[in-house]
Amino acid sequence: MAAATGGLTPEQIIAVDGAHLWHPYSSIGREAVSPVVAVAAHGAWLTLIRDGQPIEVLDAMSSWWTAIHGHGHPALDQALTTQLRVMNHVMFGGLTHEPAARLAKLLVDITPAGLDTVFFSDSGSVSVEVAAKMALQYWRGRGLPGKRRLMTWRGGYHGDTFLAMSICDPHGGMHSLWTDVLAAQVFAPQVPRDYDPAYSAAFEAQLAQHAGELAAVVVEPVVQGAGGMRFHDPRYLHDLRDICRRYEVLLIFDEIATGFGRTGALFAADHAGVSPDIMCVGKALTGGYLSLAATLCTADVAHTISAGAAGALMHGPTFMANPLACAVSVASVELLLGQDWRTRITELAAGLTAGLDTARALPAVTDVRVCGAIGVIECDRPVDLAVATPAALDRGVWLRPFRNLVYAMPPYICTPAEITQITSAMVEVARLVGSLP
């Protein structure tokens, strides 16, 4: 069967893929599950090729948490094509342009108070690198170059570049292979789901021991994403803000996965009503169209860095502030803000909660949890993709479980019936996990 894939048949695509392409977190030559060929994406649906035939499946992953408006939204398509006719790309060194200015102003307006300066980069991982670089340069500008370590709590994930890996969970995360060569950071115990003042007190005591060498505390607020899809009480963020201020340590929020409404607040920090010194956003920023991220910081951070010995923030991506990415990001954010997104997320949360409830009785299930438009089934053993993927496809859903987690972060446009279809597939996958030895 030929498809709209540049002349290659699905069989040819798989052959080229197997010979030449490396996929995320995969091996070459011994992949247990071959990739599925995607040929189209519209709304909340993907068109995949299975057994030589096209099938329509729901994108329950929002294509790794990016496509909050679904695929091919007319407003985003128009923004991209309009900008393409004017200017596809220019270097950002020495030049500026309207899409970057509009997006920067929009982000400053909607993010927590005080984040007045924006640095654009190519990806979430790079935005974390930039945030860490900001923190280190800030303290050098303050005449305290010894403040160069970072502190976080266990269970987090912040990206795949080297500094970002150093603040991912050192043992349970995806980067334990590199523990002996990564920068040695300070790790507090896993943050509990429910609020416990004793945890905050212990965190403060540990931070106090290292305050003289700490540049910043870095955390994912409310939801720890790829490190385990764990949720925690927003009051911990309020405590972190107070602790960091008292001990003169910067506070960095990684909102790459949580930003733009996913948790039920526009940004997860809003649940606690606190502002970090530095914040990273990405993923849903462009609505899933292009790769773009941003690192925002306070005027104090920006001016201190600029007044330091280097006289500049020493970072500059080639595709920084790409006009196409900025233009579609403006359209995506304005589309979100122009609708009753809070009600939409509340409805999605209700649908996920109701649909996943039956999973609680399954023998392999240890927890079921929902936060905004995030639904998670945690199992007592790893999920076998060779079993999970076809089972979900049988039910018209694209899922991508990892470790012992079956989860969904669906597009905000999903109907109640589509959410029911997604949760039914998740429950079936969890049931199969329990039926295997």
From Swiss-Prot:
Pyridoxal 5'-phosphate binds at residues 124-125, 254, 317-318. Its EC number is 2.6.1.62. It comes from the Bacteria. One of its GO terms (molecular function) is adenosylmethionine-8-amino-7-oxononanoate transaminase activity. Its main location: cytoplasm. CDD domains: OAT_like. GO terms for biological process: biotin biosynthetic process. It is an enzyme of class 2 (transferase). It holds the Pfam family Aminotran_3. Competitively inhibited by KAPA at concentrations above 10 uM and by amiclenomycin. SUPFAM superfamilies: PLP-dependent transferases. Substrate binds at residue 283. Belongs to the class-III pyridoxal-phosphate-dependent aminotransferase family. BioA subfamily. Catalyzes the reversible transfer of the alpha-amino group from S-adenosyl-L-methionine (SAM) to 7-keto-8-aminopelargonic acid (KAPA) to form 7,8-diaminopelargonic acid (DAPA). It is the only aminotransferase known to utilize SAM as an amino donor. Can also use sinefungin but not S-adenosylhomocysteine as substrate. NCBIfam families: bioA (TIGR00508), PRK05964.1 (NF004624). This is Adenosylmethionine-8-amino-7-oxononanoate aminotransferase. It comes from Mycobacterium tuberculosis (strain ATCC 25618 / H37Rv).
